[in-house]
UniProtKB/Swiss-Prot annotation:
Disulfide-linked positions: none
Keyword rRNA-binding tagged: no
Native source organism of the sequence: Haemophilus influenzae (strain ATCC 51907 / DSM 11121 / KW20 / Rd)
Alphabetical GO biological process terms: protein transport
Transmembrane segments: 5-25
Gene: yajC
Name this protein carries in UniProt: Sec translocon accessory complex subunit YajC
Amino acid sequence: MEAQSPMSTLFIFVIFGLIFYFMIYRPQAKRNKEHKKLMSELAKGTEVLTAGGVIGKITKVTEGSDSIVIALNDTTEITINRNYIVSVLPKGSLKSL
């Protein structure tokens, strides 16, 4: 049995490192960056979808806090953590439901 050279072993580790970087780390970092951008753009009047499937309109955003208030209809409001917002909906989405 022939022993592998140290360079070929190092080459294999470098290949696995590159695969890990481009297949796992980089896409996740990109998603995190997009989510942070989404969180910074939240404002009063924005229609959002939460992780629990709740759709509502933001009525209050507190900058110092992680919580926001969402109006589900004219009489019901809930307070949630801003990290549970999954996506921003187009204007008028609530009226079309």
